[in-house]
Amino acid sequence: MKFARILMIVLLVALGVTVATAQDAELGSEENPIQVFFVPSAEAQTLITGGEVLADALTEATGLSFEVSVPTSYAATVEAMCAAPDASMGFIPAAGYVIGNSRCGLEVEAAAVRFGWPVYWAAYIVPRDSDIYTFSDLEGRSWAYPDSGSTSGFIVPSVELQSAGITPGEEIEAGGHNQAVLAVYNGEAEFATVYFSPPLTPNFNWNYGDLPEPYDLTVDEAFVTDEGRLFVGDTRILDARSAVAEQAPDVVDAIRILRISDAIPNDTMAFGPDFPEELRTQIFEALVAFSETEAWAESALGADDGYSWTTLAPADDSNFDPVRLQFEVLGLTEEDVFAD
């Protein structure tokens, strides 16, 4: 009995030393890696695989260790970051950042740039043969959206629909932008709201106010390259439909864009409030350098079926005041956005 008691004491002391060692270890060490979180706006396994590519590149550039996670929802991502204020970084959309900043002081360091654009849009998509032709036609129609914490997929469309006096019918939380597109493609929803980035056409610069589909009369010419990129003729498609092109090669022929929203600040790279400033700068600079390499396209940030960032640029908290205003105008609370 005495021996067992002594053994138990020794084990408890050893466990305490192990826990204390992990807690006291320098941030970025193997014992205390930097926690990197990705919102599940794309397929989780794609983000995990691409996240490891990103983590390996950062480790090579900085000597720091990183641990990649894809929580089950936007809300869970914010909660995880807030739970590790001195060790977390995450790639989260504008609405998630605004909520995280209010909840626990998350701080933005940078924002995405996609093919030169510091902003993006929400797209309302419908079957190409649908009888939905105007915004008001969405009244009573079934609506698929990625996640209630998605800025382009839910927050901005909610504001616009309510402001226009439009009440959708059945609401389907699809689980991601890909899934929302597929919900329309498979006939499970009459419309969906997803992210929109402008198409790329040689010798043509798309501007806000142009048709979201300047190629709509030639959609039967759509094709998917060996790299999984979606084209219509020589125009590359970059909106959410492109992310499911390998699963649904005829997605552009099957789904059209009804309209797009006003511009939205791009997704963020944010840090916990107590994350060391010098490491933030080091990580940002390493990511910018990494974005200029071919390997970037294999990372969660740069992959076409990931976040499709071209690079990232410094961002200020005030950039997200328009999103805060939308919350205030509609009286939205954190509970409204992240309700179960």
Model-derived features with residue positions:
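Bacterial N-terminal signal peptides
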Residues: 7-16
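Extracytoplasmic small-molecule ligand-binding "clamshell" domains
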Residues: 25-95
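An extracytoplasmic/periplasmic, membrane-proximal ligand-sensing/linker region
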Residues: 28-53, 213-214, 219-223, 227-237, ...
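Bilobed "Venus flytrap"/periplasmic-binding protein-like clamshell domains
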Residues: 31, 36-61, 118-189, 197-201, ...
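Beta->alpha turn/N-cap motifs
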Residues: 38-40, 70-75, 83-104, 112, ...
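A bilobed periplasmic-binding-protein/Venus flytrap-type ligand-binding module shared by bacterial periplasmic
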Residues: 40, 121-132, 261-278
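Acidic, polar ligand-binding/catalytic clefts
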Residues: 79-137, 145, 149
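Pocket-lining segment of extracytoplasmic ligand-binding domains
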Residues: 142, 148-276
